[in-house]
Regions:
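N-terminal core-binding DNA-recognition domain of tyrosine recombinases/integrases
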Residues: 14-15, 31-137
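Acidic, proline/glycine-rich low-complexity IDRs
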Residues: 1-5, 117-161
């Protein structure tokens, strides 16, 4: 008798907007950031800002730090750790445009003068996020250049024949 093989697949991920549980204060903040971004022409992805707010809220509680304190180090760990780990735990698809949305969010906080004490300067935050996420000075992704091609490594020594 032949055995049957069962396959387990990971549970499907959901978009952040359909799955991210934001309390009323965070929902209100998401709306305020979205209105500000629209009015000022800054890029913002609603799934990304939902993840930013929810993951940062969780991180602030766990670490016992102010929600609005952003440093160049927290930006790095957020973009390459916290957000992805939070999305995985919540079974939420990692949103595109996370870097652009984070840049818009910290700029929003700076414009309202609500970055917490101990935060890096807004210029440092903007430069760090732009560098890490590959963004232009206006906060958009750098366009791919048509002459960008994969470069094959050149061997250091030729084999003897």
């Amino acid at each position: 008798m032949m055995g049957t093989m069962t396959m387990q697949t990971a549970s499907p991920t959901r978009t952040a907007r359909s799955a991210v549980p934001l309390d009323p204060a965070l929902r209100s903040l998401r709306c305020e950031v979205a209105r500000w971004a629209l009015a000022t022409g800054h890029p913002l992805n609603l799934d990304a800002i939902g993840v930013i707010l929810a993951a940062r809220h969780h991180e602030a509680i766990v670490e016992g730090r102010p929600f609005n304190r952003w440093t160049t180090n927290t930006v790095l760990t957020f973009l390459f750790g916290t957000a992805e780990e939070w999305c995985t735990r919540q079974h939420v698809t990692m949103p595109s445009h996370l870097g652009e949305s984070l840049l818009t969010y910290v700029t929003f906080l700076a414009e309202l003068d609500v970055l917490a004490s101990g935060s890096s300067s807004i210029r440092q935050l903007q430069n760090t996020i732009s560098d890490l996420a590959g963004l232009t000075a206006t906060g958009h992704r750098r366009p791919a250049r048509s002459n960008d091609v994969a470069v094959a490594p050149t061997p250091l020594r030729r084999g003897t024949e």
